[in-house]
């Protein structure tokens, strides 16, 4: 029995050793593949880095060559063949990869007619812009900035700036802190849009009694009070437009506002380019009708024609005289169809 049991355990041990050896070989092969894969990735990264460096070097060489070539082309100017007095400006652009080389050239030639001496001048300005034409822009619109800041626009860069305090110079409402508005070029509180001095873009932005007009001292339009009598005003080129009410005027920004109600814009003189607000003819007649008629100032009222006297028919004196005549006629009991005194008073010819 013991002899029969000997070979079986021996075979089991051999089988176990074989399995362990296979597992070790598999593990060794897997680790080798991992090491080979990581080494391949490193080689690829180094290769990509070398290619990027070579690309940058090529771009730098091309830019230098483009600048030299541009300078050669610009310098090939025969000043002797130019006219005695000459001026020229030119701009050229050369695309190199993802960059643009801009060259500005100015050529001047001035000849003194008395002495015959000639002065030559050549100015060359070269600049390089990236392919994406990026500038130092921290923001593009005001919403790009955090609360309490606004986007300040300039030629070369846009930056987020802190909002301005009260009575500080401004050109936009967003520049002022909190609930302030830009009024007459200063940040102020306790104002609402449409009031006197607030910034506007068209006539609908302003309250009644004001109009949207440019101000030379501010360089942007604001809601401006309508001018009164004697003040400069907006005078349309067509005189017939003076009869049109303000509601029918265009909605765009004006250089000057039209006159207030009851006034009309008239030139100061035939040679003057400035117009001022004056009382309209209807308003003048209305004021004259409201004034009591002084008989001492018009001693020859019976000689005034009827059409002129009709302007004063509604005056208090005329009304009182007419009532007296009617009262006398009623008392006499006779109402004559043709009363010479009445006709004489109304200015009929005798």
From Swiss-Prot:
Signal sequence bounds: 1-29
Chain segments annotated as coiled-coil in the UniProt record: 33-78
Glycosylation sites: 88, 98, 113, 196, 282
SS bond list: 200-212, 206-223, 211-257, 233-265
An annotated Gene Ontology molecular function: receptor antagonist activity
Tissues with expression: Expressed in eye lens.
Keyword Disulfide bond: yes
Keywords: Coiled coil, Developmental protein, Disulfide bond, Glycoprotein, Secreted, Signal, Wnt signaling pathway
Quaternary assembly: Interacts with LRP5 and LRP6.
PANTHER family xref list: DICKKOPF-RELATED PROTEIN 3, DICKKOPF3-LIKE 3
This protein's name: Dickkopf-related protein 3
Originating gene: DKK3
């Amino acid at each position: 029995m013991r002899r029969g049991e000997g070979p079986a355990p021996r075979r089991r041990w051999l089988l176990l050793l074989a399995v362990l050896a296979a597992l070790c070989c598999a593990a060794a092969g897997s680790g080798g593949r991992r090491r080979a894969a990581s080494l391949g990735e490193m080689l690829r990264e180094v290769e990509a880095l070398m290619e990027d460096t070579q690309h940058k070097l090529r771009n730098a060489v091309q830019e230098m060559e483009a600048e030299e070539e541009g300078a050669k082309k610009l310098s090939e100017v025969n000043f002797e063949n130019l006219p005695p007095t000459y001026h020229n400006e030119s701009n050229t652009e050369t695309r190199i990869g993802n960059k643009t080389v801009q060259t500005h050239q100015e050529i001047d030639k001035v000849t003194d007619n008395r002495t015959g001496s000639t002065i030559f001048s050549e100015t060359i300005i070269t600049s390089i812009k990236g392919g994406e034409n990026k500038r130092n822009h921290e923001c593009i619109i005001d919403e790009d900035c955090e609360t309490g800041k606004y986007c300040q626009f300039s030629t070369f860069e846009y930056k987020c700036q802190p909002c301005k305090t009260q009575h500080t110079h401004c050109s936009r409402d967003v520049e002022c802190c909190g609930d302030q508005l830009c009024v007459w070029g200063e940040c102020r509180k306790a104002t609402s849009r449409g009031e006197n001095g607030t910034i506007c873009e068209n006539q609908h932005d302003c309250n009644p009694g004001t109009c949207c007009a440019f101000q030379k001292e501010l360089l942007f339009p604001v809601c401006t009070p309508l001018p009164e009598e004697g003040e400069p005003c907006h005078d349309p080129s067509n005189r017939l437009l003076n009869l049109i009410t303000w509601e029918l005027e265009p909605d765009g920004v004006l250089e000057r506002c039209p006159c207030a109600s009851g006034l009309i814009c008239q030139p100061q003189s035939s040679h003057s380019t400035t117009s001022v607000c004056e009382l309209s003819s209807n308003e003048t007649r209305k004021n004259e009708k409201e004034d009591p008629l002084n008989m001492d100032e018009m001693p020859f009222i019976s000689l005034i024609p009827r059409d002129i006297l009709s302007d004063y028919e509604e005056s208090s004196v005329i009304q009182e005289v007419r009532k007296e005549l009617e009262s006398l006629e009623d008392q006499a009991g006779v109402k004559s169809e043709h009363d010479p005194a009445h006709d004489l008073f109304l200015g009929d010819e005798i």
